[in-house]
Design a protein with these regions (language model features):
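An interfacial alpha-helical scaffold signature
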Residues: 1-195
Length: 196
């Protein structure tokens, strides 16, 4: 199957199957060792995804299978952008294996397009690099028990903190009342902040 056929099938399928991480309850994300694409694994046939899921479980990677119906696909594909995923690995380890870059399948609203309407260019509150690094970190951390955290996970943790500081934050403010605080019975006060 060529790439165009796979794209058409992804757009028109009644359902697709996705490998989900039990560690994050989100799509299982893999970094390709050659292209460095951050990929999710998608299959058209239930028996194929079950075979791949079984292989991953045998490798001690806790995963489950999720079915995405046609009416959920656009939402699913769009959410991959906010997760930092840039590629779909379709039917991995099969004759029909195909790598699809996410923008080839769905485009984002005009955030980065110069000719986009002004209402689409507004600031978006999202931090895909934080989300992606956190997914990799949790997938690896919860996969096995460590007596001490490996150096690779410590580096990911540092990257998460660096990405967190680059985030955009929104605080509520009421004219005349100032910044709202959530006061607890024990005297603690918290300021609500919304972030990516």
């Amino acid at each position: 199957m060529d790439k165009q056929q796979v794209l058409n099938q992804l757009r028109n399928a009644k359902e697709i199957y996705v490998i989900m991480s039990l560690c994050t309850r989100m799509p299982y994300v893999v970094c390709d060792k050659e292209t460095f694409d951050d990929e999710v694994l998608i299959y058209f046939m239930e028996e194929d995804v079950k075979r791949e899921g079984k292989r991953l479980v045998e490798e001690k990677i806790p995963v489950q299978i999720a079915k995405v119906d046609a009416n959920q696909m656009l939402h699913f594909y769009g959410n991959l952008y906010t997760m930092g995923v840039n590629c779909l690995m379709v039917d991995q380890y099969m004759d029909s294996e195909c790598r699809i870059q996410l923008p080839e399948l769905v485009s984002r609203p005009g955030q980065n397009k110069p000719d986009a309407p002004e209402d689409e260019k507004k600031t978006w509150i999202e931090n895909p690099s934080l989300h992606l690094t956190a997914l990799y970190f949790m997938q690896e951390l919860r996969r096995q028990k460590f007596e001490t955290m490996p150096e690779e996970l410590k580096e990911m943790q540092e990257e998460i903190l660096a990405d967190f500081t680059k985030g955009t934050y929104i605080t509520a403010f009421q004219e005349g009342s100032g910044v709202p605080l959530l006061k607890q019975k024990n005297g603690d006060a918290y300021q609500p902040i919304f972030t990516d």
